């Protein structure tokens, strides 16, 4: 992140499982990090899940599409389907959902903020562990 050292505003892609208004603990942390970076003047493009944490199901008013893109003053938020299962007890189903979610996040991260623009860095929140690998691939294609 040499841009921080020389005063340059950075262009970042942020991958995370939750973001406001989805207020899982990781959503609170990632929302704060993004807002703090935006306050410093950085351009951020968040790729996250549709809100689903509270009931382990996509919240009312958010369903119907595989992804949604919102423009913000500091960049954009792309929300993708989290593929939640009906129960948290089926570990195989949950693992499959995380892999599928990470794959869709990866595809959307390649175009977050527009094509074919380069980014200065990728910030990937884990868990799920699959988002780390997704972030690495995103950086390979976007740097």
Task: Annotate each predicted stretch with a short phrase.
Residues 2-73:
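N-terminal subdomain of nucleotide-sugar transferases
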Residues 7-8, 115-119:
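Short helix-terminating capping/connector loops at secondary-structure junctions
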Residues 19-20, 51-52, 84-85, 128-130:
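Short, solvent-exposed loop/turn segments at secondary-structure junctions
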Residues 23, 94-109, 119-142:
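An aromatic- and histidine-rich active-site surface loop
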Residues 24-25, 56-57, 89, 132-135:
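Short glycine-/acidic-enriched loop or helix-start segments at secondary-structure transitions
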Residues 37, 112-113, 138:
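Hydrophobic helix-cap positions at the C-terminus of alpha-helices
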Residues 41, 142-143:
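Glycine-centered short loops/turns at secondary-structure junctions
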Residues 48-112, 116:
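A conserved catalytic-core segment of Leloir-type glycosyltransferases
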